[in-house]
Design a protein with these regions (language model features):
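A short helix->loop->beta-strand "cap" motif at the edges of active sites that frequently abuts
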Residues: 106-110
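Surface-exposed, active-site-proximal loop segments in enzymatic domains
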Residues: 76-86, 120-127, 166-167
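Hydrophobic positions in alpha-helices of CheY-like receiver
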Residues: 98-102
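Substrate-gating cap/lid alpha-helix
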Residues: 119-156
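Histidine-centered active-site loop/cap adjacent to the catalytic His
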Residues: 48, 52, 167-198
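Alpha-helix N-cap and loop-to-helix initiation/capping positions
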Residues: 83-90, 127-137, 170-178
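Conserved SGNH/GDSL esterase-like catalytic core that processes O-acyl groups on lipids
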Residues: 1-97, 133
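Short, well-ordered beta-to-alpha junction loops that form the rim of enzyme active sites
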Residues: 71, 115-117, 156-158
């Protein structure tokens, strides 16, 4: 049976009354894959780089066939009108280092990067916000890095862009219907990689 490791933020694991795509992905994978994941939000790219070796200790890292990962929504977060936490060049560097770390820790695994999903800008209140322009910019950085490093990419931004507003739980998270649709797309992309042995 194939072994899959999931690394991502609250779009993966849920938050504030939402489920996230992971439970739906696990359900679709029953009988075909065993999914492993950290029991915490993996946050921004530098946080994932710092902690992924600890998360790898909780799974059979040497037997993982596919790592599905995303970092981005935490990276583009603006607080009190400031710029995103890491500037673009730092996001680029952290992704490169994260890919190298994943390849070190999961030596037999193929990698699948998920771009960050769009936000509903009008729903932000308070000092923090995200913009779709920032998300597009950082997704473009990620796609460029992954292409250079030979990592497969699933454009979840494109998948979620035309979701009905009823599938949005809040400014960034999804209802079960939205999370199920994300899981369907991830399952299809992941299965294609596993079936081709990439």
């Amino acid at each position: 049976m194939k072994q899959v490791f999931l690394l991502g933020d609250s779009i993966r694991m849920g938050n504030q009354g939402t489920t996230g795509y992971e439970p739906f992905l696990r359900q679709k994978s029953l009988g075909a894959c065993v999914c492993h994941s950290p029991q915490e939000n993996c946050q921004f790219a530098q946080y994932a780089l710092r902690h992924v070796h600890q998360w790898a200790e909780d799974c059979p890292a040497g037997e993982i066939d596919l790592v599905i990962f995303n970092c981005g929504l935490w990276d583009v977060l603006r607080m009190f009108g400031d710029d995103p936490l890491p500037p673009p060049e730092v996001y680029d560097l952290m992704l490169r280092r994260l890919v190298a770390r994943l390849r070190l820790l999961f030596p037999r695994a193929a990698l699948l990067f998920l771009t960050s999903t769009p936000t509903v800008e009008a729903r932000y209140t308070g000092p923090s916000r995200r913009t779709n322009d920032d998300i597009r910019q950082y997704n473009a950085i990620a796609r460029s890095v992954m292409e250079e490093l030979g990592v497969a990419v699933l454009d979840l931004f494109a998948v979620a862009r035309d979701f009905p507003l009823a599938w949005r739980h809040d400014h960034v998270h999804y209802t079960d219907a939205g999370s199920q649709a994300l899981a369907d797309a991830i399952f299809a992309a992941g299965t294609a990689i596993l079936n081709t042995g990439e």
